[in-house]
Amino acid sequence: MSRPRKRWRDVDGVFLLDKPQGMSSNDIMQKVKRLFQANKAGHTGALDPLATGMLPICLGEATKFSQFLLDADKRYLVTAKLGERTDTSDAEGQVVETREVNLETQQILTALEQFRGDILQVPTMFSALKHNGKPLYEYARQGITVEREARPITIFELNFIEYNAPFLTLEVHCSKGTYIRTLVDDLGEVLGCGAHVTMLRRTAVADYPVAEMMPINELQLLAESFPLSELDRLLLPTDTAVSKLPALHLDAEQSKAIGFGQRVKFANEQQLSGQVRLFSAENLFLGVLNRREYYSPTTINYTIRITSLPFL
């Protein structure tokens, strides 16, 4: 007798997953999606299989706002092994060069200085960036090297934690688009000994609280023991993905007009500079507005289900 098919459902919010080592971000995202029986899911910036830590999973309407988390700052704890370079710049690759390590802590501290602030970084070949529609890692696996342009990134903090030769542990607070593997590889070259990542843990995305993270095995246990309503309580509200944007609350008349897809007048346009989070008179999150020649939400949530609204 066959098992009854799961009923997929509309469920909205952000789940803070503590990603385990050894799984791809997409595979673990699909598992979370199945456990919540969600119609839609998306992650907010891939972590390498080697890496662990915070991976926000957007469900339902929250997927419309995942780009804001992709663009958010990140924090990492990383351990590098000095003296060895690998083809992937991490422990999953093949060692391609071995050099002697004879460093004092002060030499490392001095080398770190040049990696702080606004810098340029050439992405690793083992990345998901695309060239002619194909991910770079596919070229790399075929032994093909593609020329990549250096990209601007910002290292807000690069803190020395521990050096127990040949292992060096650092804490990194960085902008979007930063490859920690490349950062470690570049540091190894500056130090003259080479280096690769042996441990990588993402400790923060935007302002999400670390205490809210949950491992997949705990989520699995809850899913097996409790109804879906209990799992839903683990979800953070959709608007947390855009919590850094200023909020604009509509009055009852404006909310009513929005519901009918009508134009809405604002008494104070200064409230609408840049992007804002839009809330109804009942404090329901409606979406994000961008300032152009007129106002229209770039995305809006399930409450209204309108893709574009004109504003005056």
UniProtKB/Swiss-Prot annotation:
InterPro entries: PsdUridine_synth_cat_dom_sf (IPR020103), PsdUridine_synth_N (IPR002501), PUA_sf (IPR036974), tRNA_psdUridine_synth_TruB (IPR014780), tRNA_sdUridine_synth_fam1_C (IPR015240), TruB_C (IPR032819). It comes from the Bacteria. The keyword Isomerase applies. It is an enzyme of class 5 (isomerase). One of its GO terms (biological process) is tRNA modification. CDD domains: PseudoU_synth_EcTruB (cd02573), PUA_TruB_bacterial (cd21152). Pfam families: TruB-C_2, TruB_C_2, TruB_N. The active site is at D48 (nucleophile). GO terms for molecular function: pseudouridine synthase activity; RNA binding; tRNA pseudouridine(55) synthase activity. SUPFAM superfamilies: Pseudouridine synthase (SSF55120). Its EC number is 5.4.99.25. Keywords: Isomerase, tRNA processing. Gene3D superfamilies: Pseudouridine synthase, PUA domain. The keyword tRNA processing applies. It catalyses: uridine(55) in tRNA = pseudouridine(55) in tRNA. Signal peptide: none annotated. Belongs to the pseudouridine synthase TruB family. Type 1 subfamily. PANTHER family: PSEUDOURIDYLATE SYNTHASE TRUB1, TRNA-PSEUDOURIDINE SYNTHASE. HAMAP family: TruB_bact. Responsible for synthesis of pseudouridine from uracil-55 in the psi GC loop of transfer RNAs. This is tRNA pseudouridine synthase B. It comes from Haemophilus influenzae (strain ATCC 51907 / DSM 11121 / KW20 / Rd).
